Each structure stands twice: as structure tokens, then as C-alpha cells.
Amino acid sequence: GAGKTTLMRLLCNIQNPTSGKILLNGKNIVGLGERYRNLLGYLPQHFGYYPDFSAFDFLLYVSALKGLDEKAARKKSKELLEAVDLSRESKHKIKTFSGGMKQRLGIAQAMLNDPHILILDEPTAGLDPKERVRFRNLISAFSKDRIVILSTHIVSDVEFIAEEIIMMKSGQIIHFGNPQEITSEIDGQVWECTVPPAYAEKHAAAYNTSNLRNISGNQTILRIIGDRPSMENAVRVQPTLEDLYLFYFKGGCEE
């Protein structure tokens, strides 16, 4: 509900802004029309496909919509199916694919026109951890020599691959910068302390707790965000993106 998908649709010129404008090289994208769209590759959160199409036929179909000639489309489709590890399933119907396979096909169709700007709206939503890692690696591989804009609410999606992060809340941008810059806001406000397991849940409920971990020796480590907790053994630790996320979205900062 922060406005991520709306922002993605605005960037793709699917929706027009009610105020303000989006510029590309100093020009409003609304006036650029097809010239702008030719630079884009877009994977929406729920991309449409014909379930009885094979993966290869689907890419040929999207290539035709994008104006690619047939010879170039066939060559590019084969290359992309290989790149997203779907070449063995190229003749299989899409309705037989897993969620991760469909998402990999989705990024392949977004890359057909070799876009300068690749926009991905929550591409890892619903994927299992293994597919999520595979998809992140795929995004990193495709990011060379192009701008990749990725929306997600999953911190690990951006923690390892993003050079710059925009954090949104209630339709507003509240942070922009590289991971080190934006996490510096809560330097000195992240703590770890050890408590007996019997008191762990009580302490966790009393503070903005980002993690609770049982360790050997019958102890529990709490990771707490905010002012120094009352436990004497509390020590400051380096903040992470997840800590910052919880600071803003779990009681550390009001709307």
C-alpha cells in the first residue's frame, strides 16, 4: 500500500500523473510516446500470458507486439530462453510452469527489445527462497549497461543487488540513497542483548524487536531497534536494511 505499483505504472507511462512529471534526459515521457516505450522493458506484478502457448511461441508473440522482425525475434527468443534457463522447456505450455518459471519467462519477454530501462514490479513475490535467489542473480546478470528499477517489499531482494534504494511510505519517498547512506539514520539505535528464554517473549513484546534467536547455553539473543533497552548487557550493533524497514514500519516512526 505504499504506492510501489502506482509508481512503476507511472514510470512505464501506463498511468499519467495527476501532478508533477517524469523526465528522461530532460524531456517529459508523456510527450515521447513510442520513442520512450522502445527503451522500456516491463514485467508487471501479474503479467498476462496465454496458458496454452509454449514459452517459445509466447516470446514470438510478444516480439511481434514489440515490432521485431521474425528472424530477429526467433534468434532473440532462443537466446533469452537459454539465459533464463528455460531452453529445455521452450516447447512446453506455460500452464505447466511453476511460479518461478513463469517469472523467468516474464523477464525474458521484458528483455526482447534489449531495453535501456528494465522495470520489474515485485518480481519475486510468491517465489520460494531458491527461486528468489535464482531470480536475483538473473536480475544482476541483466543489469549490465542498463537501468534496472525493481519494486519489492522483501528486503533481501535489494540488500544484495541494489546500488541505490528508494524507500516509500504512504505514497511518499522517505529515503533515497545507497544502503550505507540510508541505514546510517539509525546508527546507534540498534541493540543486541541476551536474556533467559523464559523472559524472551515478554521483552520482545516490550520493544521494537527485529529478531529473536535461541543460542546454546539456554539463552536468547534479542535484536532491538530504538532507544537503549533496559537490559544491562545490551550492546550497539551495525544497522541493516531490515532494521531500517522495521524502524519505519513497525512502530519506530509514526506516519
How should each PLM-predicted stretch be described?
Residues 93-97:
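Conserved ABC ATPase signature
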Residues 60, 64, 71-89:
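Conserved ABC ATPase "signature" region
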